[in-house]
């Protein structure tokens, strides 16, 4: 990956103050997306067709990737001269706030439906998985708000993360993943040749362990117990316990099945995102033993239109990692970034099939590394396979140090 990415200005629509965000009103799609399970239930009530229980599944894994293919990519950027104005425009932040009660509404209405309406096993499962997808993407809202410094924003992040029971993301992502990304120390960075299933077994427990350890260290410095209510991992966990206990009390024992299914599939959405966002990428280890500062080319990027519009621009992940506090409406594309072949929903689906995923991504990783296999994070035991596949020879002792 060439270094001119650090010096070339990003592409912009216009270098003047007359810039208009053409997607300004389209961002409402990110707000409406969490309501899709409710829309599906309305369609079931009006038509009697069970297929609508799986509306989110159909849209997420089918229609959205199709629209991404049809619409292609949007490379336009706001000129830097208007970014301060965009960042101060409350409209964009209000949209993120609005998604929070919608996530709660989708959860409560779905819980009410399965406990009061006649529903078969497959319909039950389809609704639980559909809810899991949109509530997994509550993590996306929590991601956007959790990077902000305002107390209100940070509490809104904790509230929305509580919906899917993944409150430790608030600490793990900001203080752990952003520090260690694209290094062997990061459980949320996948290795070339690693399947999503293998990745999940180290990413999910590794994320919680890192978050808890970071909070334990912070509270210790403040002279407080890790079990203090100041623990920002415990805070959203308590919210989840209260929320789920209330749902169980109101809607009965079916919640003991329904809630874990939607929660598990919600967690799977984050695992899928982490899996594709930095697959195989590696920051250079410097002579002093530290890793180079992360740059835009240490994240896979996607400019696909439809999926970005329902994900608050999450797929412009390269600029996000380089500038974590930059809001979604201001995120930029750069020249010469590592690029995913399609948007996140399509890549999430492909990731279910490891051979298919590797066939799409491994050549891209090698191209990113300019054919130098030593610049790639590779799954242990797979190095010889890739040396033979690409006809290259790596060093005898590649850096595979993993934090304990």
Swiss-Prot record:
- The enzyme's main class, written as a single word, is oxidoreductase
Q: Which residues form a coiled coil?
A: none
Pfam families the UniProt entry points to: FA_desaturase
Q: Per the UniProt record, which residue ranges are transmembrane? A: 25-45, 47-67, 94-114, 119-139, 151-171, 241-261
Which Gene Ontology CC terms are recorded? plasma membrane
GO biological process: one example: alkane catabolic process
Q: What induces it?
A: Induced by AlkS and n-alkanes.
Single Gene Ontology MF annotation: alkane 1-monooxygenase activity
Q: Which key words are in the record?
A: Cell inner membrane, Cell membrane, Iron, Membrane, Metal-binding, Monooxygenase, Oxidoreductase, Transmembrane, Transmembrane helix
Binding-site residues for Fe cation 1, renumbered to this chain: 143, 147, 173, 177
Return the EC number. Answer: 1.14.15.3
Q: How is the cofactor bound?
A: Binds 2 Fe(3+) ions per subunit.
Write out the annotated subcellular location: Cell inner membrane
The record lists Fe cation 2 as bound by 178, 317, 320-321
Q: Which cofactor does it need?
A: Fe(3+)
Q: What is its main location?
A: membrane
State the pathway, as annotated in the record.
Hydrocarbon metabolism; alkane degradation
Q: What is the membrane topology listed in the Swiss-Prot or TrEMBL record?
A: Multi-pass membrane protein
Q: Which reaction does it catalyse?
A: octane + 2 reduced [rubredoxin] + O2 + 2 H(+) = 2 oxidized [rubredoxin] + octan-1-ol + H2O
Main function: Catalyzes the hydroxylation of n-alkanes and fatty acids in the presence of a NADH-rubredoxin reductase and rubredoxin. It preferably hydroxylases C5-C12 hydrocarbons.
- Protein family (similarity comment): Belongs to the fatty acid desaturase type 1 family. AlkB subfamily.
Protein name from the UniProt record: Alkane 1-monooxygenase 1
To which species is this protein native? Alcanivorax borkumensis (strain ATCC 700651 / DSM 11573 / NCIMB 13689 / SK2)
């Amino acid at each position: 990956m060439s270094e001119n990415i650090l010096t070339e200005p990003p592409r912009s629509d216009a270098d003047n103050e007359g810039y208009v965000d053409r997607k300004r009103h389209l961002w409402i799609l990110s707000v409406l997306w969490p309501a899709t399970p409710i829309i599906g239930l309305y369609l079931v009530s009006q038509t009697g067709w069970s297929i609508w229980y799986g509306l989110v599944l159909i849209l997420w894994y089918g229609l959205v990737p199709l629209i991404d293919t049809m619409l292609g990519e949007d490379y336009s950027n706001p000129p830097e001269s208007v970014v301060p104005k965009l960042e101060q425009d409350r409209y964009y932040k209000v949209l993120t706030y609005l998604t929070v009660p919608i996530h709660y509404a989708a959860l409560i209405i779905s819980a009410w439906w399965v406990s009061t309406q006649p529903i078969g096993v497959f319909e039950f499962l389809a609704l639980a998985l559909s809810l899991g997808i949109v509530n997994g993407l509550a993590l996306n809202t929590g991601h956007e708000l959790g990077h902000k410094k305002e107390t209100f924003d940070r509490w809104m992040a904790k509230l929305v993360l509580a919906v899917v029971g993944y409150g430790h993301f608030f600490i793990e992502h900001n203080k752990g993943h952003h520090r260690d990304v694209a290094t062997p120390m990061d459980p949320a960075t996948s290795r070339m040749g690693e399947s999503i299933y293998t990745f999940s077994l180290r990413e999910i427990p590794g994320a919680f362990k890192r978050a808890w350890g970071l909070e334990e260290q912070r509270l210790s410095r403040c002279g407080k117990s890790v079990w203090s209510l100041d623990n920002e991992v415990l805070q959203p966990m308590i919210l989840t316990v209260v929320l789920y206990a209330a749902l169980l009390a109101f809607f009965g024992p079916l919640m003991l099945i329904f809630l874990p299914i939607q929660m598990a599939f919600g967690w799977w959405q984050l695992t899928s995102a982490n899996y594709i966002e930095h697959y195989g990428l590696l920051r250079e280890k410097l002579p002093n033993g530290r890793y180079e500062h992360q740059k835009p080319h240490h994240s896979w990027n996607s400019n696909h239109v439809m999926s970005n519009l329902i994900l608050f621009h999450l797929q412009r992940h390269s600029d996000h990692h380089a500038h974590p506090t930059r809001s979604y409406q201001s995120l930029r594309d750069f020249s010469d970034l590592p690029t995913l072949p399609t948007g996140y929903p399509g890549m999430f689906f492909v990731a279910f099939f490891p051979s298919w995923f590797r066939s799409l991504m491994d050549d891209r990783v090698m191209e990113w590394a300019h054919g130098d296999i030593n610049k790639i994070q590779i799954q242990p035991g797979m190095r010889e396979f890739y040396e033979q596949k690409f006809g290259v020879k790596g060093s005898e002792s590649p850096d595979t140090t993993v934090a304990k």
